[in-house]
């Protein structure tokens, strides 16, 4: 059994830290035992389980879980737009909105910002993604997008992956300004995006339920924005108006209870990712960022 410690770089301090492991007993059961692997496969391929968990988390009785969760994962309750006592269920807290000042948006039209709170990996060249795919799990852009023409446009492009842990703020935002198209739903399974699970199978990005939106941006070209559901997170909720102009940092939607992932694709020579993110990613280390921080700058020849 590989170590259940998962390290990341805290962007604000530069320190390497250990990520809290949610549901460590269940993860160990799913990874180490034959029965666990069978149960895990069944649960991920049967959306009924995620629907049941989702409904349970919307019950009023789950309010009792909010305070212990906040204390265990040291969540700053002062950032929330509403006090903890106002939330009607655990899921109501999970999809909470934050005060605008809690996540300032990095200014400048030449700056692309991080779309969500989470742990980031960036790949200046999508071709390099295979170098990170351990245990012979190969990455396929065509499988991710299920659109051969679109995949060909980004084969030489760049990619950013933001993995949201259960304790993260779970609303996601636009990284650039522009015209946002209509999301395209691709139904799929609901495999976990827990870091230890991703080490075993990076292909979950192309197997899980996901929604794809194309943003037409003057500064960054055509940006592909992908939300990927996970175990307990079958619900991806969009809150923006398709076909409308969206501002950088504007809310796009939210994930219901659980962990989840956002993937951004950029056309070739459109973005230069920030040096710290590139450096850490090359070492196989995620960088934990907050929504609205700089992700990279517009490419200029």
Swiss-Prot record:
- GO MF terms on file? phosphatidylserine decarboxylase activity
What pathway is it annotated to?
Phospholipid metabolism; phosphatidylethanolamine biosynthesis; phosphatidylethanolamine from CDP-diacylglycerol: step 2/2
For the protein in the UniProt heading, the enzyme class is: lyase
Q: What Gene Ontology cellular component terms go with this record?
A: plasma membrane
The protein, known as: Phosphatidylserine decarboxylase proenzyme
Q: Which HAMAP family match?
A: PS_decarb_PSD_B_type2
* Residues where Pyruvic acid (Ser) is found: 260
- Cite a single Pfam family from the UniProt record: PS_Dcarbxylase
- PTM (free text): Is synthesized initially as an inactive proenzyme. Formation of the active enzyme involves a self-maturation process in which the active site pyruvoyl group is generated from an internal serine residue via an autocatalytic post-translational modification. Two non-identical subunits are generated from the proenzyme in this reaction, and the pyruvate is formed at the N-terminus of the alpha chain, which is derived from the carboxyl end of the proenzyme.
Q: How does it assemble?
A: Heterodimer of a large membrane-associated beta subunit and a small pyruvoyl-containing alpha subunit.
Coiled-coil residue spans: none
In the record, what lineage is assigned to the organism producing the protein?
Answer: Bacteria, Pseudomonadati, Chlamydiota, Chlamydiia, Chlamydiales
């Amino acid at each position: 059994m590989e170590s259940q410690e998962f390290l990341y770089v805290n962007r604000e301090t530069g320190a390497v830290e250990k990520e809290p492991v949610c549901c460590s007993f269940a993860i160990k059961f799913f990874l180490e035992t034959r029965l666990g692997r069978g149960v895990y496969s069944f649960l991920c391929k049967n959306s009924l389980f995620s629907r049941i968990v989702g409904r349970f988390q919307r019950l009023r009785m789950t309010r009792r879980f909010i305070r212990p969760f906040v204390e265990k994962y040291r969540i700053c309750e002062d950032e929330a737009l509403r006090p903890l006592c106002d939330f009607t269920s655990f899921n109501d807290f999970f999809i909470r909105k934050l005060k605008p000042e809690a996540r300032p948006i990095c200014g400048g039209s030449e700056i692309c910002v991080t779309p969500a709170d989470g742990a980031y990996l960036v790949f200046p060249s999508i071709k390099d993604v295979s170098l990170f795919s351990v245990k012979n799990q190969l990455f396929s852009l065509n499988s991710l997008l299920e659109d051969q023409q679109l995949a060909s446009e980004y084969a030489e492009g760049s990619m950013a992956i933001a993995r949201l842990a259960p304790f993260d703020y779970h609303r996601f935002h636009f990284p650039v300004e522009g015209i946002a198209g209509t999301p395209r739903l691709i139904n799929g399974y609901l495999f976990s995006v827990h870091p230890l699970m991703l080490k075993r199978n990076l292909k979950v990005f192309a197997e899980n339920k996901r929604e794809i939106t194309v943003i037409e941006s003057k500064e960054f070209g055509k940006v592909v924005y992908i939300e990927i559901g996970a175990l307990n997170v079958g619900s991806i909720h969009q809150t923006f108006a398709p076909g409308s102009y969206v501002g950088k940092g504007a809310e796009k939607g939210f994930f219901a209870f659980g962990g989840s992932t956002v993937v951004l694709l950029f056309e070739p020579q459109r973005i230069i990712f920030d040096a710290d993110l590139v450096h850490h990613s090359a070492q196989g280390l995620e960088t934990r960022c907050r929504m609205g921080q700089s992700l990279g700058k517009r490419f200029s020849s």
